[in-house]
Design a protein with these regions (language model features):
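Residue-level signal for well-ordered alpha-helical positions
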Residues: 63, 83, 159, 186-187
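GST-like fold's C-terminal all-alpha helical module
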Residues: 87-176
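Long hydrophobic alpha-helical segments typical of transmembrane helices together
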Residues: 166-193
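Active-site-flanking alpha-helical
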Residues: 61, 152-153, 184
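GST-like domain detector, emphasizing the conserved glutathione-binding G-site
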Residues: 1-110
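Short, hydrophobic secondary-structure boundary micro-motifs
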Residues: 67-72, 95-97, 135-139, 181-186
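A local structural micro-motif
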Residues: 15, 38, 164, 182-183
Length: 193
């Protein structure tokens, strides 16, 4: 989801190869593209495979420097990278207890103490970033940090945990972002197959 949303938001053309998960040949198809055996994976025009969302988006920022995929300000960029890395490496309890399922609407399900701890930390990150940037996104304009938290927004839409007013408004803005709505529409179509 993350690199897809970033590419769409910045209007960068790409070819998508859909590999259905949970099929007998899924792993083999993925291994044909990336040695990690995981998705997503970006294959550059030079034929190089880049996997892991954050590495993909760093590569995209390098390949397309005309787009401010990271904040231009050095201090803001460092903070954006920090919260992106925290998202990449953390929040395991949220991921485990509130899996991302676009079609799910299950308020309150998965609200374990550990998941709620993760949610409180995310709420604090968003609130702090939005206060410092004056929004509408975490660092003013949409950037990689916002893309990193897009799957969390989907979880919050499904499970509806209690959030601050600031974070709920941010989640709503993210959900309404054209690139995110396009991803949701495609995900729903794919789920219906």
């Amino acid at each position: 989801m993350r690199p897809w949303v970033l590419l769409r938001h910045f209007g960068i053309a790409f070819d998508e190869t859909l590999i259905r998960l949970g099929q007998p040949d899924t792993k083999a198809k993925i291994l044909d593209v990336t040695p990690s055996g995981k998705v997503p994976c970006l294959v550059t025009d030079a034929g190089d495979a880049v996997w892991e969302s954050l590495a993909i988006m760093e590569t995209l920022a390098e390949l397309h420097p005309q787009h401010a995929m990271w904040p231009r300000d050095a201090a803001a960029r460092a903070r954006a990278r920090s919260i992106s890395a925290e998202m990449h490496a953390g929040f395991a309890d949220l991921r485990q207890n509130m899996p991302m399922q676009i079609a799910t609407h299950a308020p309150g399900i998965g609200a374990t103490p550990a998941a709620l701890f993760d949610i409180a930390r995310i709420d604090a990150i968003w609130t702090d970033c939005l206060a410092q940037s004056d929004g509408p996104f975490l660092f003013g304009d949409f950037c990689i940090a916002d893309a990193m938290y897009a799957p969390v927004v989907m979880r919050f839409n499904s499970y509806e945990p209690a959030l601050s007013e600031t974070s709920r408004a941010y989640a709503n803005r993210m959900t309404q972002l054209p690139a995110v709505t396009a991803w949701i529409d495609d995900a729903r179509k794919e789920s219906a197959r």
